[in-house]
């Protein structure tokens, strides 16, 4: 089922691979239309509009996976490495559940900031915006460069599901397994244990 969806709609999946003609046509069409890059002042309203569109379509998330709904966007921000971002967002009501949801997005941002303080580990830049009663966690994509560049990426979920002898919820354990198979050097395995 996932492969069928990726073949039809996988134009902006993680990494550099695009599967199938339909997804490639969708990606090429998007590039020909030159998706607008949101200015710093337009970003909050742009994110709010994207969240509302996703909510009105009843889409719970994206092909990027995870428990929070999300979308990808292009935004201009001084000092950013790339305009490409993944944006997770909360709902916009005042319930306790939505408040916890918003708090978790903020905690994820703080965790990314904490990881960035470890000299030997690189982590994506992130920031939190609050607008229209929603919290938005914006994370720079490390698999994109410039407006059109795509870098290779294989998620840990994909590797575990297809290549590792067993799965783990522990990154350090997964790193040790990949090191034992010769896929990661000792430094990379140690970095995963640190995280």
Q: Where is each model-derived feature located?
A:
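Phosphate/dinucleotide-binding and metal-coordinating scaffold of catalytic cores
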Residues: 1-195
């Amino acid at each position: 089922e996932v492969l069928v969806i990726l073949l039809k709609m996988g134009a902006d999946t993680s990494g550099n691979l695009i599967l199938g003609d339909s997804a490639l046509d969708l990606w090429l069409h998007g590039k020909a239309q030159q998706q607008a890059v949101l200015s710093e002042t337009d970003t909050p309203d742009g994110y709010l509009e994207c969240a509302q569109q996703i909510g009105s379509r009843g889409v719970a998330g994206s092909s990027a996976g995870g428990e929070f709904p999300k979308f990808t966007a292009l935004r201009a921000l001084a000092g950013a490495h790339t305009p490409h971002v993944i944006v997770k967002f909360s709902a916009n009501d005042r319930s306790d559940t939505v408040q916890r949801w918003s708090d978790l997005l903020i905690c994820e941002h703080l965790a990314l900031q904490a990881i960035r303080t470890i000299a030997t580990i690189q982590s994506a830049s992130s920031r939190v915006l609050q607008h229209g009663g929603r919290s938005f966690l914006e994370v720079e994509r490390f698999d994109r460069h410039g407006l059109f560049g795509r870098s290779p990426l294989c998620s840990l979920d994909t590797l575990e599901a297809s290549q590792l002898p067993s799965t783990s919820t522990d990154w350090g354990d997964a790193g040790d397994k990949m090191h034992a198979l010769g896929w990661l050097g000792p430094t990379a395995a140690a970095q995963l244990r640190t995280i």
